[in-house]
Amino acid sequence: MTEISILNDVQKIIVLDYGSQYNQLIARRIREFGVFSELKSHKITAQELREINPIGIVLSGGPNSVYADNAFGIDPEIFELGIPILGICYGMQLITHKLGGKVVPAGQAGNREYGQSTLHLRETSKLFSGTPQEQLVLMSHGDAVTEIPEGFHLVGDSNDCPYAAIENTEKNLYGIQFHPEVRHSVYGNDILKNFAISICGARGDWSMDNFIDMEIAKIRETVGDRKVLLGLSGGVDSSVVGVLLQKAIGDQLTCIFVDHGLLRKDEGDQVMGMLGGKFGLNIIRVDASKRFLDLLADVEDPEKKRKIIGNEFVYVFDDEASKLKGVDFLAQGTLYTDIIESGTETAQTIKSHHNVGGLPEDMQFELIEPLNTLFKDEVRALGIALGMPEEIVWRQPFPGPGLAIRVMGAITEEKLETVRESDAILREEIAKAGLDRDVWQYFTVNTGVRSVGVMGDGRTYDYTIAIRAITSIDGMTADFAQLPWDVLKKISTRIVNEVDHVNRIVYDITSKPPATVEWE
């Protein structure tokens, strides 16, 4: 795989991945301060970090115990680099354990803590500058530090945690037992900002303009005079990739828009009009709907759906590429969240993403993924910076597998049509209500469940459609949107009256976690 990444002269803070469910949020929060940040494996060596030249390092939380035989470790030379290090939860315990302190099961020193707790600051610290002496933080640990290494001192504790914050300012080493990256730590952003700006000396000048200039340079360096194929899905991500690549390599880019029969209502024509017309991208439109739907017939398992679609998507590309000369690269709109949710060596796979785990091993192309260091809100900001109109940039997110993962169970034309029509009504009414910017994502799902109803004087036995609407910043966590009842009522009434084979509407009021945004 060809990795499109950030050039070496950018200030960056590296987050070492120890398997926490929150580790991606650490990088996301740091980026909010205008500082580039990304995750790296905990197996990285001190020499590799020297080559990256970060201004700071964060050791993430994790599910293991630092004293266990299978515990994730750290190259001890990293502590000698002179780079500021912040250990969070497991990261603090790792610093303690490796530098001569003591970590034990929490029952031997206070209690386990899961949830909000009050942090009591006992000394002033640059890390906590501008925050109150007592503050609510999110704890999530089953082990505790009982002895701190030589050169460290106590900064803060809680009722159940004797060492909740420690530091060795001489060596620029800091440890906190709680999670500042989550919103339940009320002053968590201030703490992370203090680390990035005050302790690491970040300038805070990272922006989308930086990203555009450096990614264009990197793309040109990687591609040279060769040709690139881009798959357009109709979503924001691939559209932004198309405009970025066109700026970088011009007519070396050919876009293939594969109509796999799983698109939203009128999506094909809209894609051709927006990107082919307004931006002049060279787009080949391929009607492969029968090819995909035949393969998906009777397939119920969502992971199998994703794999089938991912494989066939690339085989369609192979077929089209064989008609072209000298195509070496396949571009995708893979995001940072896609990579994270598809699993790392320390974290379990949540779901395989079409842009990550669904590609065949015998693929003929090298991959280019210009957005794979960005979160969704950053992609929108990138689109605006590229001069794209808001109707494209704020287009509703749409997964690569399309409506296949918005139809529960086996896919049929009838089920697909219920989702297409109901989704169009939902989007129309959300826009009419002026909520299209407040609600981060919204769509409908054919649940595959039929229920009894009465329409007119007759009995019906038709599908139940679920409405999913969420609010979020980056897609990693989300709350269900509290839509006004009158809006929901109008949407429900219209769907039942206007969409055939539907007689019941339900509203999904589940947050992420525990649920994911998509149902499959």
UniProtKB/Swiss-Prot annotation:
Residues 12-205 form the Glutamine amidotransferase type-1 domain. The keyword ATP-binding applies. Keywords: ATP-binding, Glutamine amidotransferase, GMP biosynthesis, Ligase, Nucleotide-binding, Purine biosynthesis. It is an enzyme of class 6 (ligase). It comes from the Bacteria. GO terms for cellular component: cytosol. ATP binds at S233, G234, G235, V236, D237, S238, S239. The active site is at C89, H179, E181. It catalyses: XMP + L-glutamine + ATP + H2O = GMP + L-glutamate + AMP + diphosphate + 2 H(+). Residues 206-395 form the GMPS ATP-PPase domain. Disulfide bonds: none annotated. The keyword Cytoplasm does not apply. SUPFAM superfamilies: Adenine nucleotide alpha hydrolases-like, Class I glutamine amidotransferase-like, GMP synthetase C-terminal dimerisation domain. GO terms for molecular function: ATP binding; GMP synthase activity. Pathway: Purine metabolism; GMP biosynthesis; GMP from XMP (L-Gln route): step 1/1. Homodimer. PANTHER family: GMP SYNTHASE [GLUTAMINE-HYDROLYZING], GMP SYNTHASE-RELATED. Catalyzes the synthesis of GMP from XMP. This is GMP synthase [glutamine-hydrolyzing]. It comes from Streptococcus pyogenes serotype M1.
